Amino acid sequence: MTSIAISSGSFDPITLGHLDIIKRGAKVFDEVYVVVLNNSSKKPFFSVEERLDLIREATKDIPNVKVDSHSGLLVEYAKMRNANAILRGLRAVSDFEYEMQITSMNRKLDENIETFFIMTNNQYSFLSSSIVKEVARYGGSVVDLVPPVVERALKEKFQTPLK
């Protein structure tokens, strides 16, 4: 049986922290779908298509990663892909509390889906897409925070010179 996992998020934009979780998940599972979810509570900076393109470029060297988007429930997407696992990265205890609520709801919706938590690498424990955008907005260097394709996209969006 093929083991298929879903790594979902808004990825607005994808960071090196996200990429670390995806790479580590790809070592454990046969296939990993990186799925951009349309979060109605967030106003995206990059369009869904832009985010998909950025993720595709950032993950192009990971052969068992596929990139997609979805606007419904994650468990429905997982069923559609015959996935048996959801991957979630944890930066801190505060992440766990939120993720536990989501995991409980997903389990209520589909008891066959397991959630796997991966602790983020310490060097990314402070990192979030929001922080990256804030740093880039004011011309700060994000070179150690995001893949090169994302750095270029941020500079273009904010029209700031590369540092």
Swiss-Prot record:
Pathway involvement of the protein, from the record: Cofactor biosynthesis; coenzyme A biosynthesis; CoA from (R)-pantothenate: step 4/5
Entry cofactors: Mg(2+)
Residues bound to substrate: S10, K42, L74, R88
A GO term, aspect molecular function: pantetheine-phosphate adenylyltransferase activity
UniProt cross-references to InterPro entries, sorted A to Z: Cyt_trans-like, PPAT, Rossmann-like_a/b/a_fold
Gene Ontology cellular component annotations, sorted alphabetically: cytoplasm
Record-marked site positions (Transition state stabilizer): H18
Keywords assigned by UniProt, alphabetized: ATP-binding, Coenzyme A biosynthesis, Cytoplasm, Magnesium, Nucleotide-binding, Nucleotidyltransferase, Transferase
Gene Ontology BP annotations: coenzyme A biosynthetic process
Reaction catalysis annotation: (R)-4'-phosphopantetheine + ATP + H(+) = 3'-dephospho-CoA + diphosphate
Localization per record: Cytoplasm
Pfam families assigned to the protein according to its UniProt record, in alphabetical order: CTP_transf_like
Chief localization: cytoplasm
EC number: 2.7.7.3
Residue sites binding ATP per the record: S10, F11, H18, G89, L90, R91, E99, Y124, S125, F126, L127, S128, S129, S130
Gene3D superfamilies linked to this entry: HUPs
HAMAP family: PPAT_bact (MF_00151)
NCBIfam families to which the protein is assigned, alphabetical: coaD_prev_kdtB, cyt_tran_rel
Record-stated family: Belongs to the bacterial CoaD family.
Name of the protein this chain belongs to: Phosphopantetheine adenylyltransferase
Encoding gene, per UniProt annotation: coaD
